[in-house]
Design a protein with these regions (language model features):
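Formylglycine-dependent sulfatase
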Residues: 1-203
Length: 203
């Protein structure tokens, strides 16, 4: 996209290699905030500098709930690049293990106790996506922005997910492990409310 004049950013989980050679910055992105692969990353404790949060190629000491920080970085990126074409890849760590959420979010959940933290994590992620959408609307970019929301696998049994009516969980070939949401929004070009039956694969 660079030859077409786009600025690009990658935020969150970079699951495409662990060495500097495969870092997002060395794969064409202009900006990066997040961590390198290895599956999970703690949501609150970012002190392990052997598995750090990066800004660009530089490991940084960070504080705050990771889902919140990724959202804040996304909103900031949109504000800084609102007057030029951009591509922003936002890969939330949520709702991957470990099950960690802000206490105030957990208190708002009144479901099965074993699922309260997972539900709070989903709520926090949902709010984050809403903040990104609101940032696009604030800068009058929403209608002409292609927005894609998807996940890489079904819910995890160890995280007390419930994929019903689909059978199975993450790491299974049943539909509960691989049949996931894929939502596209582009008001200027696509009519809303439609359903596409063509299979999609996100990897």
């Amino acid at each position: 996209l660079k030859p077409a004049g786009y600025v690009s950013g990658a935020l969150g989980k970079w699951h495409l290699g662990l060495t500097e050679e495969y870092h997002a910055i060395n794969r064409g992105f202009d900006e990066f905030y997040g961590f390198m692969g290895r599956g999970a990353h703690p949501y609150f404790d970012h002190s392990d500098m052997s598995h750090p949060i990066y800004r660009g190629l530089t490991p940084i000491k960070e504080e705050g709930y990771l889902t919140t920080r990724i959202t804040e970085e996304a909103v900031d990126f949109i504000g800084r690049h609102k007057d030029e074409p951009f591509f922003l890849y936002v890969a939330y760590n949520a709702v991957h293990a470990p099950p960690e959420a802000p206490e105030e979010d957990i208190k708002q959940v009144t479901g099965d106790e074993t699922r309260d933290t997972l539900m709070a994590m989903i709520k926090h992620l949902d709010n984050g996506v809403g903040e990104i959408v609101n940032a696009l609307k604030k800068h009058f970019l929403f209608d002409n922005t292609l927005l894609i929301f998807l996940t890489d696998n079904g819910g995890s049994g160890t995280m007390h997910a419930n994929n019903a009516p689909l059978r199975g969980f993450k790491q299974m070939d049943y539909e509960g492990g691989i049949h996931v949401p894929f939502i596209v929004s582009w008001p200027a070009e696509l009519e809303g409310g439609k359903k596409c039956e063509v299979p999609m694969w996100s990897i």
